[in-house]
Amino acid sequence: MGLNIRGRSFLTLLDFTPEEINYLIDLAVEFKRLKNNGVEHKWLSDKQIVLLFEKTSTRTRCAFEVGARDLGMGVTFLDSGSSQMGKKESLADTAKVLGRMFDGIEYRGFKQSVVEDLAKYSGVPVWNGLTDQFHPTQMLADIMTAREEFGDMRGRKLTFFGDARNNVANSLMVVCAKLGMHFCACGPKELMPEDWLIEKCQAVAAETGAVLEFTDDVAVGARDCDVLYTDIWLSMGEPAELWEKRIKLLRPYQVNKEVMAMAKPTAIFEHCLPSFHDRETTVGEDIYQKFGLEAMEVTDDVFLGHQARQFQEAENRMHTIKAVMAATLGAEF
């Protein structure tokens, strides 16, 4: 397919050109076609990878494990309870050891500096499965899903509703800037992206023709929107008093049928999951009992409606992650 990114780490999309990002998505589309047609593609059967998880995961872990096995690779999983990294062994030492045993390393955890240091010291490709700052593999799936709907994404408007300073919103702003899209962050003024990242993305947008917009007005965010996107409002383990504050702050930015109606009739809804769209979880029921909310960031009718694409998006995590691993490990296409 033309581009060569063999040996590179995948830490943030700020490190990749628009052509490289589209190349990875094109490759993911091809992997999806192969898998759907039952065509074997064990092109990396001589490779071994390790997955380092300091945070729990469903989609990211499954996508890496299934994708790696589809490519013929061996997979080792280490969580915080089965690794000495940062406890009895320094991060640098762990990285050097893993780099001698494995061909690639995935990391899902907290600090962006950890995944960057793994790449610095290991000597092998390192893939960011999520940090507090960025979630780049999610972005490839998000754009792939939108491309399956609209084709070329240049000029298309994607609006993130809610906490626009979180890792998903950060990464959406980056990928939209890279691909010449119209990105809108719609949320409370105190939860807008950090200035340093806005400045980086504005510099990218000046080259690609992207538009970056920031508003606390839901109608402005939804107007002419092609992709309406949201994420959960709170994380597990946070104190109840923080829940109350965040729910009060973010409740006006819930994606519901009224918000969807303000967007283009052809608009789609995306969500990185998990979602609190009903009371069918312990957390959902707890929120209902404490605050009387049947749903949080998105209502059940939108989540289950004809414009929703979050499960297609979740499947595409596997295809896009497979593309990242294959391209950086040097599979022959």
Question: PLM ranges: what are they?
Answer:
Residues L71, M101, Y121-S122, L179, ...:
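Short, structured coil segments at secondary-structure junctions
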Residues A95-K96, D103-V175, H271:
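Anion-binding alpha/beta catalytic cores of soluble intermediary-metabolism enzymes, centered on
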Residues F53-V66, E148-D231, M236-E238:
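Glycine-rich phosphate/diphosphate-binding loop of Rossmann-like nucleotide-binding domains
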Residues M1-C62, V66, F134:
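Positively charged, low-complexity intrinsically disordered leader regions
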Residues Q48-M101:
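Active-site cofactor/substrate anionic-group-binding motifs, chiefly glycine-
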Residues D286-F333:
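C-terminal helix-to-coil terminal segments
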Residues Q202-T299:
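Rossmann-like adenosine-cofactor binding region
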